[in-house]
Amino acid sequence: SVKDRIGLKMVEKAEAEGRIKPGDTLIEPTSGNTGIGMALVAAVKGYRMIITMPEKMSKEKEVVLKALGAEIIRTPTEAAWDAPESHIEVAKKMQAEIPNSHILDQYSNPANPDAHYEHTAQEILDDFDNSLKMVVAGVGTGGTITGMAKRLKEDRPGITIIGVDPFGSILGGGDEVYPYHVEGIGYDFFPDVLNNDLIDEYIKLPDPESFQMARRLIKEEGLLIGGSSGGVVWAALQKAERLNAGDKCLVILPDSVRNYLTKFVDDEWMDEQGFLETA
């Protein structure tokens, strides 16, 4: 996923600064993909990896993490971010108890947006000319969109950055927090790495449209993408209508279908949630 980049960047930065060394324990609160990215790096470099992850996140993510040698602690989905039982607070408690353990903390670590400022945005600049007028991306920690937006606005003034945020999250406006099914985007707090000043506007994302579009893209375009990717494409279709002929809109699809085979890909799951489209 897009989070593999920040997993490597955060670990290598901490190593270069002398804060961690192989044999230490890394603990990361995550919705799954950052944990997988860090577990990939931990497996290669010789770190113990502990993941704290809300219950709503897919079984597939847990299976991949275990295959990479990570230890997983599940936490209640309904727990507020600062509640003692939340994935963030459980990680902090474990760090206080385990010697030589570290939370690199994707929510506040500058290496998160830096990975996308230095690499993702550069790849975009290499691949697009000045016809790129709009970028649409989901917002979770905010690292991807913040890093990309900062660099793109430096090089292409006037580019429009659209953030996509689920209903039930506060990142894109509103103060009502409630459960939603799409994974990896949205929060009930504002992560330190998120710079909303770089985001020109938000579009709020309903669950059904997110999963229905993902299923459509799989079936019609052969794009084996995750649920939030479907949501970002749905949002882009709303916003791209205002572009002129020849203008280009880039949409960031952060992960694949692998993590969601027992969720939105499955007709029975979609039907249980009331999301299944009828012919």
Enumerate the language-model features and the residues they cover.
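PLP-dependent amino-acid enzyme catalytic core
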Residues: 1-279
